[in-house]
């Protein structure tokens, strides 16, 4: 975990202001978390700000310690104009694939906002949102754009809390500390106990678990949403 540094410029409203100058009335920042996890949902947060100065120290969630991130999330929740979460379950990820699962989660988040945005800023190079919104992709947006930085913090804290709840239900997989991502503890639990109902069964980690490999499913790209067991 990398802490925020005073040498890194704080996020700005530059991209949001460009979109507003181009005609957007409301701009939302989006960030996702959970894309690379073996277990748990992929989650997207959409955040709308009002142009006021952000909480001091706001930055990409990955640059904050867990304690600082939790404190920052409390400040962000009371500061933003609105925010909402959308998620796609492991079963939806298995059925749709990650790109479409991200799109589904993003649309759920945007549809749940109290104010409908005209344009959205997405962290990274790829537009996983699509119509009907105007989408601006921006590399390192979670570090440089105020609304995306806010979404980054809220998304990470919210998903971590969900995974901590799963840890209480399925102890031993390290969900509370590893959030469903690969780790030695997670691998050992999978080898001994197999996947839980919250694991993604279409992912290749199951190929390395001979005892549980029969549970892996594959998605038939020729038949949308069709799953079958791996032979």
From Swiss-Prot:
<dbReference type="Pfam" id="PF01351">
    <property type="entry name" value="RNase_HII"/>
</dbReference>
<protein>
    <recommendedName>
        <fullName>Ribonuclease HII</fullName>
        <ecNumber>3.1.26.4</ecNumber>
    </recommendedName>
</protein>
<dbReference type="InterPro" id="IPR022898">
    <property type="entry name" value="RNase_HII"/>
</dbReference>
<keyword id="KW-0963">Cytoplasm</keyword>
<dbReference type="GO" id="GO:0043137">
    <property type="term" value="P:DNA replication, removal of RNA primer"/>
</dbReference>
<dbReference type="InterPro" id="IPR036397">
    <property type="entry name" value="RNaseH_sf"/>
</dbReference>
<dbReference type="InterPro" id="IPR024567">
    <property type="entry name" value="RNase_HII/HIII_dom"/>
</dbReference>
<feature type="domain" description="RNase H type-2">
    <location>
        <begin position="25"/>
        <end position="223"/>
    </location>
</feature>
<comment type="function">
    <text>Endonuclease that specifically degrades the RNA of RNA-DNA hybrids.</text>
</comment>
<keyword id="KW-0464">Manganese</keyword>
<dbReference type="GO" id="GO:0003723">
    <property type="term" value="F:RNA binding"/>
</dbReference>
<dbReference type="InterPro" id="IPR001352">
    <property type="entry name" value="RNase_HII/HIII"/>
</dbReference>
<dbReference type="GO" id="GO:0005737">
    <property type="term" value="C:cytoplasm"/>
</dbReference>
<feature type="binding site">
    <location>
        <position position="32"/>
    </location>
    <ligand>
        <name>a divalent metal cation</name>
    </ligand>
</feature>
<dbReference type="GO" id="GO:0006298">
    <property type="term" value="P:mismatch repair"/>
</dbReference>
<dbReference type="GO" id="GO:0004523">
    <property type="term" value="F:RNA-DNA hybrid ribonuclease activity"/>
</dbReference>
<keyword id="KW-0255">Endonuclease</keyword>
<dbReference type="GO" id="GO:0030145">
    <property type="term" value="F:manganese ion binding"/>
</dbReference>
<dbReference type="InterPro" id="IPR012337">
    <property type="entry name" value="RNaseH-like_sf"/>
</dbReference>
<comment type="similarity">
    <text>Belongs to the RNase HII family.</text>
</comment>
<feature type="binding site">
    <location>
        <position position="123"/>
    </location>
    <ligand>
        <name>a divalent metal cation</name>
    </ligand>
</feature>
<keyword id="KW-0540">Nuclease</keyword>
<feature type="binding site">
    <location>
        <position position="31"/>
    </location>
    <ligand>
        <name>a divalent metal cation</name>
    </ligand>
</feature>
<keyword id="KW-0378">Hydrolase</keyword>
<dbReference type="GO" id="GO:0032299">
    <property type="term" value="C:ribonuclease H2 complex"/>
</dbReference>
<keyword id="KW-0479">Metal-binding</keyword>
């Amino acid at each position: 975990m990398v802490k925020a540094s005073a040498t890194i410029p704080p996020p700005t409203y530059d991209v949001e202001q460009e979109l507003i100058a181009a005609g957007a009335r409301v701009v939302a920042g989006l960030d996702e978390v959970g894309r690379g996890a073996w277990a748990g949902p992929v989650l997207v947060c959409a955040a709308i700000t009002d142009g006021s100065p952000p909480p001091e120290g706001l930055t990409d969630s990955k640059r904050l310690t867990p304690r600082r991130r939790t404190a920052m999330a409390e400040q962000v929740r009371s500061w933003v104009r609105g925010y909402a979460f959308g998620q796609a379950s492991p079963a939806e990820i298995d059925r749709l694939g990650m790109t479409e699962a991200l799109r589904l989660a993003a649309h759920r988040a945007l549809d749940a906002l109290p104010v409908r945005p005209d344009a959205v800023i997405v962290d990274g190079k790829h537009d996983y949102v699509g119509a009907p919104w105007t989408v601006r992709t921006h590399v390192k947006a979670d570090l440089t754009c105020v609304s995306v930085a806010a979404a980054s913090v809220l998304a990470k804290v919210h998903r971590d809390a969900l995974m901590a709840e799963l840890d209480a239900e399925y102890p031993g997989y390290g969900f509370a500390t590893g959030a469903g991502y690969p780790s030695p503890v997670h691998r050992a639990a999978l080898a001994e106990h197999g996947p839980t109902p919250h694991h993604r069964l279409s992912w290749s980690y199951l190929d390395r678990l001979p005892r549980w490999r029969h549970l892996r499913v594959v998605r038939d790209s020729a038949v949308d949403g069709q799953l079958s067991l791996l032979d």
